[in-house]
């Protein structure tokens, strides 16, 4: 990974609560919906989120995260990693909610995938998103990856504007499968940026 200097630093397991909260913001409530399903009625969905953030492996792991600190507190985070060089087969057992997301990821092989980009509400509008996206480009370049990818909800206009302003362009869309997750969007949008 690139050398990180303040305000950036690699995430640690101690950042699990902040990472879970930021994943909630970035996913527009999808992550807590899934965590609640994993815990069952009366379970602690945030415990599931923290546990996933503390994992050593997997997409949502502190090892794939960089945090941006302000006044010694996590203000924002980036979670990202390289996508495989070839599309991954979509198994029949994959939950329907994930199929459109996997289809879009499969359209962006060999890119550096920005899985999560989020800031706490009080920290928005301060340039953290742009700074973290620039850092993502540095990380990708150091890894020899020539393009970056992001998937965003069509209803997340603020994030979409940020991505467009920083050079990302729409490539494809897939209809969301929501089950009982309440979200105003209807489609997932894949954006790419060539380095």
How would you label these PLM feature ranges?
Residues 1-17, 25, 32-37, 193-195:
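Conserved N-terminal entry element of GNAT/NAT acetyltransferase domains
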Residues 27-53, 63-64, 88:
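Conserved GNAT-fold acetyl-CoA-binding loop/helix
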Residues 54-67, 83-88, 113:
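A short helix-loop-beta-strand connector motif used in the catalytic cores of GNAT acetyltransferases and
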Residues 67, 73-82, 113, 118:
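Conserved beta-strand in the GNAT
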Residues 81-116, 178-179:
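Conserved acyl-donor/pantetheine-binding loop and adjacent beta-alpha core of acyl/acetyltransferases
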Residues 96-99, 146-149, 153-160, 164-166, ...:
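C-terminal "cap" of GNAT-fold acetyltransferases
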Residues 110-114, 124, 133, 140-151:
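Conserved GNAT acetyl-CoA-binding A-motif
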Residues 119, 125-138, 142, 161-165:
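Conserved acetyl-CoA-binding loop-helix of GNAT-fold acetyltransferases
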